[in-house]
């Protein structure tokens, strides 16, 4: 495992959390790891596909892109949002 820390803001959560993911994790896996710390704790569960983007960007990362391929820097802020 190649640990890679990111700050994550989950849609409708009031916290930004430091979450450790793996460089080989897909964006779907990253979204799941972030959701684990938010959903059913401070955010109600919801149907839909979770997506990842750079903080305050409108462009979503491809779901199968890995952290290593994303160009993100350690501790950079990402948003996890539900796809409309």
Swiss-Prot record:
What is the enzyme's main class? oxidoreductase
Q: Which purpose does this protein serve, as stated in its record?
A: Component of the toluene-4-monooxygenase multicomponent enzyme system which catalyzes the O2- and NADH-dependent hydroxylation of toluene to form p-cresol. Also able to convert benzene to phenol, catechol, and 1,2,3-trihydroxybenzene by successive hydroxylations.
Which superkingdom, per the lineage?
A: Bacteria
Output the Pfam families linked to this UniProt entry.
TmoB
Q: What happens when the gene is disrupted?
A: Cells lacking this gene show a complete loss of toluene-4-monooxygenase activity.
Please give a single GO biological process term from the UniProt record: toluene catabolic process
Q: Does the keyword NAD apply?
A: yes
Provide this UniProt record's keywords sorted from A to Z: Aromatic hydrocarbons catabolism, Monooxygenase, NAD, Oxidoreductase
Q: Which family does the record claim for this protein? A: Belongs to the TmoB/XamoB family.
Q: What is the protein name for this chain?
A: Toluene-4-monooxygenase system, hydroxylase component subunit gamma
Q: Which SUPFAM superfamilies match?
A: TmoB-like
Can you name the source organism?
A: Ectopseudomonas mendocina
Enzyme Commission code: 1.14.13.236
How does the annotated pH dependence read? Optimum pH is 6.8.
Description of activity control: Inhibited by Zn(2+) and Cu(2+).
Please give the Gene Ontology molecular function terms for this protein: toluene 4-monooxygenase activity
Q: Which pathway is it part of?
A: Xenobiotic degradation; toluene degradation
């Amino acid at each position: 495992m190649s640990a890679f820390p990111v700050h994550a803001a989950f849609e409708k959560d009031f916290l930004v959390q430091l979450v450790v993911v793996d460089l080989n994790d897909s964006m779907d896996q990253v979204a799941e790891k972030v959701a684990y710390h938010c959903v059913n704790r401070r955010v109600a569960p919801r149907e839909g596909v979770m997506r990842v983007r750079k903080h305050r960007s409108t462009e979503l990362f491809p779901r199968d892109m890995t952290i290593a391929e994303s160009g993100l820097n350690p501790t950079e802020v990402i948003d996890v949002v539900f796809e409309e």
